[in-house]
């Protein structure tokens, strides 16, 4: 079962597949060395990066993420402020402290961190880490694939089914299965998801995780609207959320007469989160970093304009959104490198639309209709980040998709006819569309806006 613990993970920006996943892979590699009793013999580490990870890796801080993972840190607990100093020290000394200081090994950044233009065979995001002893003998080598949303899998386990899956009361593979459970038992999506979660862990742990997810999202918005400046990288993108926030605060009475001013607030919420992500801040995968602004922006819309935002509302929103996200993870992809941005922003839009419909009192059928509408109108969305960075068009795209999610929810709630397209069919279509998409438009920065906009 794919849990809300899988779909919503606290991490660091700017990318779940290119930053969070590689950091986890680096940490896993070190843990494996220790478990195999080879750690003490390591003298040098070497990293090879392939495919989309390589082509947009510098802009996504993939190399930095791998190093921090080898250093013994994970995305949810790494000290963000420590990273620049640590990386500079590695580059200057050509030494890398691994496993949180347990050992120092040789690491020449230019020679031991190699970005290749080629792809590995199993997935678009591949990386191989090699440990060598003092005589340059290979002690251990492992290839990892970062398959989207911060999920990683090593070569030996790629494509394999989950070992010893936990039996849940309401198993599902498709939206059709979920709707059947809801109809037969008189349950909402969020209730079905919660009862499945309780097969994995106690209720207190689930509630604590969901509370921490929303707390982190809120903190991200707060930091985003109060942090001025220019985002890292050659694009020199100026943060827009703070100025928009000031405008909305200063003109609240006048703007209240504008029926569209709600959109300005939704835009601001999304911009704040994604600007924090682009700056390498603390964010929550929802389901990815590149699309991390949509789920919090839509719940913030509810809090400001619908409310009140109780703990029960937060939980039901995230449970329903997470359940819809799991359908895409199981039956399609949430990796921009695999299916384009429809797998990131498209999925996040679908998740947020479903979550909002759930807490607005929609039926399970309406929740799935909202999710379907949101994805249907993101089909074919390309992933063409300018300069290989998660800034243009990514930041603004989250704002647009947040508004689209709200609209999808409203359309689903007010629909009086049966839909012609089901959620399962749109998920199937999204995956096929992504696989048919030219690799130029799947997070390689080789086509689209990425080759039309000049970094200066």
Question: Where do the model's predicted regions map?
Answer:
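Structured, active/binding-site neighborhoods that engage oxygen-rich ligands
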Residues: 2-5, 20-23, 27-28, 36-102, ...
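Short alpha-helical scaffolding segments that buttress acidic/His motifs in well-ordered protein cores
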Residues: 7, 11, 266-274, 317-325, ...
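Conserved phosphate/anionic-ligand binding catalytic regions in large, soluble enzymes, centered on
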Residues: 8-26, 279-298, 339-349
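Alpha-helical support elements that line or immediately flank enzyme active sites
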Residues: 17-34, 296-308, 353-361
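C-terminal regulatory domains involved in ligand/effector binding and gene-expression control
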Residues: 75-254
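Accessory "access/gating" subregions that flank catalytic or transport cores
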Residues: 203-340, 448-456
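Hydrophobic alpha-helical bundle architecture
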Residues: 309, 320, 326-399, 411-420
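Extended hydrophobic packing segments that form well-structured cores
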Residues: 420-456
